[in-house]
Amino acid sequence: MRSFLTVFLTLSLIFAISCALKQKEIDPWLNTISGGKPPEIDITGKWYDTQGSGFFTWGEGYLRQEQNKITGTIGDYNIKGVVSGKIVCLVFLSRNTVYYTARLEMFQDLLSGNYFKATNKEQKRGYPTSFTKTVDPTKK
């Protein structure tokens, strides 16, 4: 029974890893999931997780948008993404491994939506998350 359990757990882990979004799949996946509309927003700037503190927070983020492409960091994760209309689709990477994806929508200075485990390529049943943009006091 013990060996069966070990084999089952090992195969489950291999299956979960093989189903996750891979580094080479990011660009095609982002283009497919985003919808391909021209960007209506620019999310370049400094962002904060609205949860602030607690068990799980993303932390501070710095995003740069060029046309519809997004790069940057949020907390310990490197970010790659696209903007389609007012929708933002992000991939959270660390050491070339995809851990999470997110689908967010811009409402004034708030990005709000859901994040998903990398194994959830269809982005169903996500976890709520949101980020608020920091106002640069020198630009007032």
Q: Residue locations for each model-derived region?
A:
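Amphipathic/hydrophobic helical signal segments and adjacent flexible N-terminal regions
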Residues: 2-46, 52, 130-140
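Extended, hydrophobic interaction surfaces within ordered domains
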Residues: 19-20, 111-115
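Short acidic/polar inter-strand loop motif in beta-rich domains
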Residues: 121
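Central antiparallel beta-sheet cores of small beta-barrel/beta-sandwich binding domains
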Residues: 29-107, 114-115, 125
